[in-house]
Amino acid sequence: MKYNQNTKIMQITEKTLIVGVDIAKEIHHARAFDFRGIEYGKRIEFSNDIDGMKRFLKWAADIMNKSNKEHLMVGMEPTGHYWLCFAQFLRDKKHKVVLVNPFHVKRSKEFDDNSPTKNDRKDPKTIAMLVKDGRYVEPNIPEGIYSELRIAVDIREMLTKDLNKIKNRVARWLDIYFPEFNKVFADWEGKAALITLKEFPTPAKILGIGAEEILAAWKKEINRAVGAKRALKLIEAASQSVGKRDGIEMAEVEIKIILEQYEMLVKQLKKIESKIEELFMQVPGANEMLSIKGVGVITAAIFIAEVGDITRYEHPKQIQKLAGYNLVENSSGQHKGQTTISKRGRRRLRSALYKMIMPILANNKEFQELHKYYTTRKENPLKKKQSMIVLCCKLIRVFFVILKKGVKYNGNKMLRDIKRPEIRNAA
């Protein structure tokens, strides 16, 4: 997987036909060039279905026969999800598929005509020229268990977003119709609070039934004792509520629908997380990853889902760059800019690593010692957040070795980064 630009350029020979494809939802556009940038044939438009893809291959094959080319390299932008089917079709036919960064396409499209114009004729050439110059990457399309795991993680992210929207709707509803509710219940997702919202959500309903009926409703589903003081506090809050009273009938219908959606999403989320755990445990090295104190199943599964098969990587810095944790600096002349992380890469991977490092710091002694060392050392002490990012990169290296070499986690090796003055002086 590790190719520098020279290696990428060397893969393109005089026998290679480079095709740049501008991907769209229904109609793709393509142009063909050789390794010097000379165009062959006419631009083609083809549909995003089997007939269109076969037509594309026939067009490319005709050009290759006429120009004495032996290899086809197809470059494209990863536009949304529209490129996936076409890329799979080409890979099934044993043709090389590469991707160019949409940001690079945007920046380089003015080279030929000094114009920011974007159209279906111009973009395929821009893409092909980037490929010709070795400015491409080979797509990391997961297969087998890694593909299943990534899709499962995608589903979990979708459900989590939907659940957050539902939670916000409940919070909005309470702010409008019963703003005092949160003074009685610290969390509306608690059992007693949910029963209240289902059975008697409005102040008028609460005042109409009294404390005994409220307690009886709670005790039906809650085994532990629920205090009468809480019921009296709820009645008092309802009696003093400043919530909106107009349209209250449909407000009750609204909260009922919202809570039904909430319960459905919670159930679906538990189900998909159980499936994620099942899939993750099939990945070689999963148990070794979980042996690190503080590493949870879900965050570890997200790491694997984003990175894919570890054998595709030659160095942990590739994963660090994939996560957007590689360091960048903006300096010129005597001006020395501030060093920051690039944040270019897989957002979910970067987020998972950062979320993972917090419980690790709370539970793992080796990481705690490293964190203390990085933030208190005499030379170049780091701020706490900077140290956490450094530890995220350290965690990447630990995972890389565990998965690549099939070894167990060794906390003592972690501490080799700490420079101990007493040891140096003794030497």
Where are the language model's segments positioned?
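A detector of single, family-specific signature residues
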Residues: 1-427
